[in-house]
């Protein structure tokens, strides 16, 4: 029978600091409200009839509290060496991993805030996490350098038991960082969704880490908990203000900060495949959105659902374009997606020619297509429920289905 593992002292200190971080986040966000509005870092909620100015980029506050917690926490995992001198040799590789991870997250918070202020283009959004992930990749190279993977059972007759990916493994880790930071950013647009999905993912990772504390990779999962516990509580404080009806917007800063934090623990904690499984809804949303993200199908600047002021419910938003402007590939994708029930396509004509409309290709709009118009709060709850189901499926795969592919 599984017993709850004994927590080391640094984790208890981390938990206490995280609880203080929750209080600090809840307190600081309303305290800085006026400063953000005065700096014109504010906007209107397009899904509300009210045109009140709401402060944006509040992820920078939860991110700053997160960093302060971990900066103050740095000495505690190494107290035996600092104070009692009981260790034979200082664990430099653990110290470098901690500092390198903090550097990557700190860079991403800074670059995310720059994006909120400067309103960068999408091509820049791909470059920012790539640059911020370089310290992370260097830490992995100097501390571990292992690029060999265990081949799944069905492929072993062809590739053997182990396969050295070499530089491709670093490309994979860099792409993982880019995906994590942008995946949360493109599944957004309604109150509480960005912070809510991040909260569910972090809670799932914490549970996974605790279960694995009695395993062979205890130190890696303790390292992950050092980051996930404060992230969970600072995000909870942010969600308190971002929940419907939202009093603040989290901004791209939070999406980048959350994504890089997940990438850090997934890469340095050596469970990147499990990490990706926790991103199931985000992976589906990304694949579903690809035709618009690649501009095969015209993509408007905002793809969030639209408010029906008469019913007070959110409905699907649409992309409208001239039919003749669509390429052969775009036409083919539209027809296939429509036949599969993934898109609503409408055709019309006026004096300017023939036009085509299709709902914007996001998971949010797809749920509205399947379940019909719904209240914004209920839509957020449905999406978070889907995230929880994704985590449950991940645990089933990780501890049951994995036996079909690996020797565990």
Swiss-Prot record:
Keywords of this entry: Endoplasmic reticulum, Glycoprotein, Glycosyltransferase, Magnesium, Membrane, Metal-binding, Transferase, Transmembrane, Transmembrane helix
GO molecular function, a single term: UDP-N-acetylglucosamine-dolichyl-phosphate N-acetylglucosaminephosphotransferase activity
PANTHER family in the cross-refs: UDP-N-ACETYLGLUCOSAMINE--DOLICHYL-PHOSPHATE N-ACETYLGLUCOSAMINEPHOSPHOTRANSFERASE
Name assigned to this protein: UDP-N-acetylglucosamine--dolichyl-phosphate N-acetylglucosaminephosphotransferase
Residue positions the entry lists as glycosylated: 146
Positions of transmembrane segments: 11-38, 59-78, 92-118, 122-143, 167-186, 193-213, 219-242, 251-269, 272-293, 376-400
Main location: endoplasmic reticulum
S-S pairs: none
Binding site for dolichyl phosphate: 125, 178-186
EC id: 2.7.8.15
Entry's family note: Belongs to the glycosyltransferase 4 family.
Lumenal face of the membrane: 1-10, 79-91, 144-166, 214-218, 270-271, 401-408
Residues on Cytoplasmic side: 39-58, 119-121, 187-192, 243-250, 294-375
Reactions accelerated catalytically: a di-trans,poly-cis-dolichyl phosphate + UDP-N-acetyl-alpha-D-glucosamine = an N-acetyl-alpha-D-glucosaminyl-diphospho-di-trans,poly-cis-dolichol + UMP
Membrane topology annotation: Multi-pass membrane protein
Subcellular location: Endoplasmic reticulum membrane
Field pH dependence: Optimum pH is 7.4-7.6.
Cofactor: Mg(2+)
Regulation of protein activity: Inhibited by natural nucleoside antibiotic tunicamycin, which acts as a structural analog and competitor of UDP-GlcNAc. Activated by Man-P-Dol. Activated by manganese. Inhibited by diumycin.
Pfam families the UniProt entry points to: DPAGT1_ins (PF21383), Glycos_transf_4 (PF00953)
Binding residues for UDP-N-acetyl-alpha-D-glucosamine: 44-46, 56, 191, 301-303
Assembly description: Homodimer.
GO cellular component, one term: membrane
This protein's record includes keyword Zinc: no
Any one biological process term the GO annotation gives: protein N-linked glycosylation
Superkingdom classification of source: Eukaryota
């Amino acid at each position: 029978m599984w017993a709850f593992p004994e927590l080391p002292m640094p984790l208890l200190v981390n938990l206490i600091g995280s609880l203080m971080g929750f209080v600090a986040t809840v307190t600081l966000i309303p305290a800085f409200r006026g400063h953000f509005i005065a700096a014109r870092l504010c906007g209107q909620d397009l899904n509300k009839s009210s045109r009140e100015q709401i402060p944006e980029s509040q992820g920078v506050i939860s991110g700053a509290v997160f960093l302060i917690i971990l900066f103050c926490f740095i000495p505690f995992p190494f107290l035996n060496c600092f104070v009692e001198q009981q260790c034979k040799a200082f664990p430099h590789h653990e110290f470098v991993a901690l500092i390198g991870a903090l550097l990557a997250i700190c860079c991403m918070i800074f670059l995310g805030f720059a994006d909120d202020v400067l309103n960068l283009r999408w091509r820049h959004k791909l470059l920012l996490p790539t640059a911020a992930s370089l310290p992370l990749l260097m830490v992995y190279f100097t501390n571990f350098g292992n690029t060999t993977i265990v081949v799944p059972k069905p492929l072993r007759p062809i590739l053997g038991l182990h396969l050295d990916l070499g530089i491709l493994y670093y490309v994979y880790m860099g792409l993982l960082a880019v995906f994590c930071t942008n995946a949360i950013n493109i599944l957004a647009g309604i109150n509480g969704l960005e912070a809510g999905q991040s909260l569910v993912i972090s809670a799932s990772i914490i549970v996974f880490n605790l279960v694995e504390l009695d395993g062979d990779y205890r130190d890696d999962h303790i390292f992950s908990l050092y980051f996930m516990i404060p992230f969970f509580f600072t995000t909870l404080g942010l969600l308190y203000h971002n929940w419907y009806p939202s009093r603040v917007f989290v901004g791209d800063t939070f999406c980048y900060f959350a994504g890089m934090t997940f990438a850090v623990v997934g890469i340095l904690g050596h469970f990147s495949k499990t990490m990706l499984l926790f991103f199931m809804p985000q992976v589906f949303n990304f694949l579903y959105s690809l035709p618009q993200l690649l501009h095969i199908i015209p993509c408007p600047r905002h793809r969030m659902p639209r408010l029906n002021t008469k019913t007070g419910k959110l409905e699907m938003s649409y992309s409208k374009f001239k039919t003749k402007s669509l390429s052969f590939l775009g036409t083919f994708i539209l027809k296939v997606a429509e036949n599969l029930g993934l898109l609503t396509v409408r055709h019309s004509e006026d004096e300017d020619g023939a036009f085509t409309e299709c709902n914007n290709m996001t998971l949010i709009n797809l749920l509205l297509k399947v379940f019909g118009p719904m209240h914004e709060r209920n839509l957020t709850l449905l999406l978070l429920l889907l995230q929880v189901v994704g985590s449950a499926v991940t645990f089933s795969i990780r501890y049951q289905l994995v036996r079909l592919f690996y020797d565990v």
